[in-house]
From Swiss-Prot:
It is found in: Cytoplasm. Pathway: Lipid metabolism; malonyl-CoA biosynthesis; malonyl-CoA from acetyl-CoA: step 1/1. PROSITE patterns: COA_CT_NTER. This is Acetyl-coenzyme A carboxylase carboxyl transferase subunit beta. Binds 1 zinc ion per subunit. Belongs to the AccD/PCCB family. Its EC number is 2.1.3.15. Component of the acetyl coenzyme A carboxylase (ACC) complex. Biotin carboxylase (BC) catalyzes the carboxylation of biotin on its carrier protein (BCCP) and then the CO(2) group is transferred by the transcarboxylase to acetyl-CoA to form malonyl-CoA. Zn(2+) binds at C33, C36, C52, C55. It comes from Prochlorococcus marinus subsp. pastoris (strain CCMP1986 / NIES-2087 / MED4). It catalyses: N(6)-carboxybiotinyl-L-lysyl-[protein] + acetyl-CoA = N(6)-biotinyl-L-lysyl-[protein] + malonyl-CoA. Acetyl-CoA carboxylase is a heterohexamer composed of biotin carboxyl carrier protein (AccB), biotin carboxylase (AccC) and two subunits each of ACCase subunit alpha (AccA) and ACCase subunit beta (AccD).
Length: 292
């Protein structure tokens, strides 16, 4: 091998070593799109809302990034940030539930899988709940259910519209019935919110499944979804085995649900804030009065 070939091979190895297929990984300057294979400079991807500029694939983002996209700068005020899950059932599979909680808290910096609070969107008030898939797959346990219920109740008292950003594998099995009852609790709070003719919009992101889909994710006045998001209750394989037939390739995607009337609009992440602004104005939401 010549010296030139050696340097070329070395440069190639260094370049490839810095390419990541996971935009959430902190190391590496380059990210390879899992959909089309396009390699993008990480900073360019972030500035494009973590959407692939080549194919439009929406990469998964965390709750803080979601809030920054939706809320006006410095307007978000978090609620119930100290609520943390316990292990009432002393659940253990290969590892204890307590260990899994601790690991997720250390890995994400979150207490549990949702952040809730009040904010403004182009000066219009909004109650906001953002689920974070990094925390045990965004599963819904008692703390997630309690925080969402509380922010819905706050919105009802203040006459605020609500947006819940869904990203979840469903109910948290480690909490058993305590997890499942959150479906009814949140739904009940939303019914009281609706009784005051207030606007509720869920945003279904990839993935939204299980008990979340079977409850508050599908109760919105307007149901929004991100492109190609996986949305469903049971998994594709389970359904195919039960029905004993092949499902369409696009089954359980946002586009499939839009076509069949389960989703009202698919919103590109870059257009989310402007879309929310239009919807809030259409529904008569007034701008907050600024006080000194």
């Amino acid at each position: 091998m010549s010296l030139i070939d050696w340097f070329a091979a070395r440069r190639k190895d260094q370049f490839v070593g810095k390419v990541s297929q996971d935009p959430e990984e902190s190391d590496g300057l380059w990210v390879k799109c899992s959909e089309c294979g396009q390699v993008a400079y990480r900073k360019d991807l972030i500035s494009n809302f973590n959407v692939c500029s080549n194919c439009g694939h929406h990469n998964r983002i965390n709750s803080d990034e979601r809030i920054n996209i939706i809320a006006d700068k410095d307007s978000f005020k978090e609620f119930d940030e100290s609520l943390s899950p316990t292990d009432p059932l002393k659940f253990k599979d290969r590892r204890s539930y307590s260990e899994r909680i601790k690991e997720s808290q250390q890995g994400t910096g979150l207490k549990d899988g949702v952040i809730t609070g009040l904010c403004s969107v182009n000066s219009m008030p909004l109650a906001l709940a953002v689920m974070d898939f990094r925390f045990m797959g965004g599963s819904m346990g008692s703390v997630v259910g309690e925080k969402i219920t509380r922010i819905v109740e706050t919105a009802t008292i203040k006459n605020y519209p609500i947006l819940i950003v869904c990203a979840s594998g469903g109910a948290r099995m480690q909490e058993g019935m305590l997890s499942l009852m959150q479906m009814a609790k949140i739904s009940g709070a939303l019914k009281k919110h609706r009784a005051k003719n207030l606007l509720y919009m869920p945003l279904l992101t990839h993935p939204t499944t299980g008990g979340v889909t079977a409850s508050f994710a599908m109760l919105g006045d307007l149901i929004l979804a991100e492109p190609k998001a996986l949305i469903g209750f049971a998994g594709r394989r389970v359904i195919e085995q039960t029905l004993r037939e092949k499902l369409p390739d696009n089954f359980q995607t946002a586009e499939y649900l839009l076509e069949h009337g389960f989703v009202d609009v698919i919103v590109n992440r870059k257009e989310l804030k402007s879309t929310l602004t239009k919807l809030l104005k259409i529904h008569g939401v007034k701008e907050l009065v600024q006080t000194n």
